[in-house]
Amino acid sequence: MVMFIERGIRGGLSQCSHRHAQANNKYMESYDPSKPSSYLMYYDVNNLYGWAMCQPLPYAEFRWVNDISNFDVNAIALDSSKGYVLEVDLEYPQHLHDAHADLPFCPARDKPPGKRQDKLLATLYDKKRYVIHYRNLQQCTRYGLRIIKVHRVLEFAQSPWLRDYIELNTRFRAAAKNDFEKNLYKLMNNAVFGKTMKNVRNHVDVKLLTKWNGRYGAEAMIAKPNFHSRSIFSENLIAIEMRELEVKFNKPIYVGMCILDISKVYLYEFHHEYMLPSYRDKCKVLYMDTDSLIYHIECEDVYETLKHDIARFDTSDYASNNVYGIPLANKKVPVLMKDENNGAIMTEFVGLRAKMYALKVDGKKVTKKVKGVKTNVIARTITFDDYIQCLEGHIEMTRDQSRIQLLHPEDSKVPRFHRKNIKLRNKKR
């Protein structure tokens, strides 16, 4: 049962669906009326995991359902006292592929072409033995995916037992007067989620020893069958890492798995139930991360639509005298979308891959992101044009990054500079 839940744990989805886009609208100085009016919008969900933690979550009475031949997942209420996680085979019908190309349902871990490491990929392939929460499965079937076979069903008792705690911290955060308080109450929620996701398989046993001989000396530890590795810090100090002899599964990973799955429900709902019906084929996802979406939208005035559907958005950080006439509303309300630019016009976006993109916003510095690279290196050595060159020329650029790190401590007691070569590249399609 534990391994069944582990197979259903999939983190936040991060992908770059379209590589480059430019806005062209009446709020820009470079507006060209001869071209279609278009906007670049960067939406972020307020407290997505906080909202998911307020939903009914498992807490007891776990059991396998014996008779699954007549099991109807669509008959289960969202607030049912019983919840389910299913292992199913899913078919992704061909006629849905074009409509779902920007944001396919049911992301799965797999190796991208030419890569060795598994990544979370949103694909249009059929799914085999896919472990999924019943709410996500209900959403998938509503949008046309077909259940071919149900292999197993795990039943559990559920209730919104975390809701009061999460809502209390949310109220405190909305009333916070400074960034410290805002971050504190955000952490109070996120820390709970982090504990539900703790992987005890990764725990290590490290011993710091100062002697060679004896029952608890370095010699005895190295001779044990569960010895893993050692690092010598000095003549009289050594660290020895031992493999765990037993693993105690005492973390509620079933809660974390359900939170991750339920959180994806809202992002898919926003895209497929709101954005696509509102803009149809004039709207496409450029980039998405765990709780954010960057869109390219062709319309006359996206802010008029936002104003009309303000119940879906948090506009509390807009300027009080903004040119769009949008009222300030819904401050920090969970699971509402927020315009990350707060009305400032995003003029251009370029994305090379997940966690590697850049964007221009009128009146602000260029935003440049490269995962794993220090902020000062990005600011000093990488420009927006570098992203464009990598994209259009299919070239690879490199930069040097230095940090102080203790390398091979058995050879040297003194930390020294470590120079790492980082790459800015675009994968050919």
Model-derived features: positions:
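Conserved acidic
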Residues: 1-429
